[in-house]
């Protein structure tokens, strides 16, 4: 995909499409043209039916879904506590682990937080990353052999926010490099 192939008119046409609830029988409702699902209802649905509908919603429908109740806030809180402990340990050890967007030391980052969480607190790791709804959506879009990676980025007061960018696999590439990839991977 080349920059000159990107047309605002094409984006406007996609954005103008209306999501119809009747096309997605497993969805609970549509809000702001986005499908909203109830996690418990998806869990109780035939897995193949849920996979098909989610893949269709992501690929041919609005391209985004909301699944209410997918993540237990207490699990997120437990993982957040461990992540801040890891950041505190990094800072105490004099490791300035910043991001690509702010001056060193302004923001905090945990590279490979997936492994670091697993080592720091295996139970929290399993509860956090073993989410059945995230697995369902990931399998619907990527297939059963998807792989997870995770980083933690904290924009601290006074730190520069990240700018819109692509992470792996089309992350920090020149336009010429990106143009070599087919449209569907953008």
Language model region names:
Residues 1-60:
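Fe(II)/2-oxoglutarate
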Residues 66-68:
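Short loop-to-beta-strand entry elements in the cores of soluble alpha/beta enzymes
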Residues 53, 57-62, 71-186:
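Non-heme Fe(II) oxygenase catalytic core, chiefly the N-lobe of the double-stranded beta-helix
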């Amino acid at each position: 995909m080349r920059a000159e192939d990107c047309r605002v008119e094409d984006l406007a046409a996609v954005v103008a499409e209306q999501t119809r609830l009747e096309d997605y029988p497993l969805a609970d409702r549509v809000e702001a043209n986005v499908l909203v699902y109830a996690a418990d209802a998806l869990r109780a649905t035939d897995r193949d039916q849920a996979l098909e509908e989610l893949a269709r919603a992501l690929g041919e429908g609005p391209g985004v879904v909301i699944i209410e109740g997918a993540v237990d806030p207490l699990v997120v809180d437990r993982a957040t506590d461990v992540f801040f402990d890891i950041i505190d340990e990094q800072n105490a050890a004099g490791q300035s682990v910043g991001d690509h967007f702010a001056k060193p030391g302004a923001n905090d980052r945990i590279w490979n937080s997936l492994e670091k969480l697993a080592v720091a607190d295996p139970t929290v790791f399993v509860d956090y990353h073993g989410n059945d709804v995230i697995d369902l959506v990931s399998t619907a879009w990527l297939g059963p052999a998807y792989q997870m990676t995770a980083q933690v980025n904290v924009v601290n007061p006074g730190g520069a926010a990240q700018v819109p960018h692509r992470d792996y696999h089309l992350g920090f590439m020149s336009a010429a490099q990106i143009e070599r990839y087919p449209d569907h991977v953008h």
